[in-house]
Amino acid sequence: MRIGTVEIDSRLALAPMAGVTDVAFRQICSELGAGLTCTELISSKALCYHDKKTFSLLQQFPGEHPAAVQIFGSDPVCMAEAAQIAIEHTGADIVDLNMGCPMGKIVNNGDGAALMKDPEKAGRIAEAVVRAVSVPVTAKFRRGWDMGSCNCVEFAQVLEQAGVSAVAVHGRTRAQVYSCLLYTSPSPR
């Protein structure tokens, strides 16, 4: 598999997960076959303000390649600057944009899954980050804000136009948060 110019030797990729994908967990997953690792979500504002605790989230294990760093935020200028800072600090191979976090403290600031309600803004963010870094940019988002607004296809098209190299779609909406999914196939007519 390839994302932009980054070759990934395994079909297994480690998803970014807040509070889970720290450096030790990423190393274990890499040793067990993950071909791509990713940090947990990192605040673009905290990177722009040079918060020391936030920089600890960027720690990598020796030889962690290919690796992605995931940032979140809703200001295109800050997101572009944060992407540059993250790449300069880590040498990561990919910048991943979190546009799917459903947690209140994130969406209440207009970040994460809140961007599902404003695809044009998401596109401006993606475009700014793509212009700011020389590595591929990817994005993770959800099926939609709620079941009445499942706009993931249109959202992906906006991001593609902005220059994003790949997307990952979380199968739940923001309203479903992390609830159990029960999908049934359509009944025959």
Name every feature range the model reports, one short phrase each.
Residues 17, 42-44, 72-74, 100-102, ...:
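Active-site beta-loop-alpha junctions enriched in small/polar residues
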Residues 1-15:
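N-terminal amphipathic alpha-helix/helix-capping segment at the start of soluble metabolic enzymes
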